[in-house]
C-alpha cells in the first residue's frame, strides 16, 4: 500500500516555484503567499479570451523515480484557464507529442466540432499540428479539461477551468482555491490496462486472508462464513472489489503534490474561502473531509445549488464541487481525500502560518461489499440463463405503461435505434445482457440517492448525497419527458469487459435523439462497481424527488442502483456518452449519441411519444 513518497522536490516543481517566486518579488510576497492569494493549483492561471497550449512530454519525479509524463505547457496539472461567461474564447492547441492528441472541455456547452473527441468531433490533433478551438462561453462555474486520446489523461494531460459569471457572484469570498485531485502511476497505463485484462484483481491487495476467515468463523459461525465464501467464489468476485486500480500502483495527488508534498493554502483566520474541488483522476473516487472544519456546498458540476452544510462527501471521477469554508481559529486544517477502497489518500493543508500543520487522519478500514446493502439481494450471476425462459424477453412493448415515475411514459421499440432492446420495465434484462460480456444482473435495483455509499453509511457526521441537493432557482427545464431510454450498466469483472446493455462500443450503433426533444434516461447498474457516467454536450438533470432537479454533467451510479435524469437534446451533433473510469471506457462502456433534426414529414411523432430501451 502506497500512501506517501520521498520528500525530495521534483526539479519540474522546483523550477516552476522559482518562476512563481520571481513573479511575486515585486509584491513583497513569498512564493507560498503568492500561490495562496492567487488561488494557484501550483500551475499558473491564464486569463483572457485567447490561449496557446502546447501538449508535450517531460520527465517527472513524483514517487522517487523519474518517469515520463504528458504535459500541458510543460506542467502537470496543466494551467488553470480563467474565462468570463459571455465571451468567445480561442484556444490554439499545438501537439508536440509523437502521437495524436486532443483536448476535451469537460461539461461545457459548445458546438460538437469543438468538443475534442477524436472520431466523433474531429480527427484529433496530429503530431506537430495546431488545432484552434473557438466557441462562446455559455455558462459559469468550475470545470476542467483533459485529453480524450488513449490514456494521456492518466499520464498528465488535464487542467482546471474557472468561468466567472457575467452577473455579480452571489457568494463573496476572500480567497478562491482550485483543488485538483488525481491519481498517478509510475506504470505505463497501457501496461495497467493489459494487466487488468489478464487478471482484474491484480491491484487489489485488500483481499481476504486466512485471519479474516478465522475472525468470521468467530463472529458469523463456520456454516455462514463458508456460505458467504461459496457465494462470492461462485460469482468469481470479491466483496472487496471497490476499485480496479489501487494505491498499490497509484500515488494520489492534490494539485500535483503527493501526500508528503503537502500542498498548502495560507489564509487569515476569519476569512471566507471558496474551495473548487475537481476530481481529475482516471479511476479514483475520493472521500473528502476537512477535520474540524464544516463545509457548505454552493455549486456542483459548475451549476449553483441551494447551499447545504456538510462534513464529508464522495466525489466521483470527473465531478466538481464548490464549497465555502470559514476557518476562524488560528490553527491548521488537513484537507483529506481518501480513496474509496482505502488504499491511499491525497492530502493538503489549510493554514494561517506555513510553519503550522495539522494531524493527518488514519485511513478507514477497507469496507466490505454486501449483496443486500448494495441492493443486490436478488442478483443473478454467471453467464448462463439460470433456467429462465428468455425467449419471451425480446418482444414488442408498444403501449405498455412504465410506472417507475410520476410522469410515466410508455415503452415502444424504436426503429431508429435498433439496439435498444425492449423490456417489460426498466429492471428487466434484455437478451443482450446474457452472454460472456455480462457476469451479473440485478433483479432488485434500488433508489439510492440518499445513500452516502459503501464505507460512509455509519459516519457520526453529515455526509453529502445527491438527495440533499437541488439546482438553485428551481427546475432549470421541463419535468415532463416525451420518452424514456433505459440503459443497464453491464460488465464481466473477471474478463474486464464493460458495456451498456451488454453491448460494447465496438458492436453498438449510435443512440439517436431528435433536436430539442426532452428525454428521460434511466440507468440501472447491474455491476458491483460504482460508475461515473458522462454525457458530452448536454445537461443531465438528475431527478432527486419531489419535482426537484440537480443539473449535472457527470452522474455517479452506485452498485445495484437505479436512477433517472432528464436531457434536453438542444445541440445538434455527435456526442460521446461513457463511463468516466478511463479503463472502463476503453474496455467498452461507451456510446455515441447523435442529435439530429426531426423528419420534416412528422414521422418522428411516434418516436417522440414513446419510451424505449437502449
PLM features per residue range, with description:
Residues 136-140, 326-332, 568-574:
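Short, surface-exposed loop/turn segments at beta-strand-coil junctions that are enriched for proline
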Residues 291, 295-296, 320, 324, ...:
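Conserved small-residue hotspots that stabilize compact domain segments
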Residues 62-64, 107, 113-122, 296-311, ...:
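Active-site pocket scaffolds in enzymes
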Residues 38-47, 51, 419-423, 427-429, ...:
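N-terminal pre-domain segments of enzymes
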Residues 78-79, 261-264, 274-276, 284-285, ...:
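Generic recognition of flexible, low-complexity loop/linker segments
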Residues 99, 169, 186, 283-285, ...:
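Short beta-strands and strand-coil junctions in structured, solvent-facing domains, enriched
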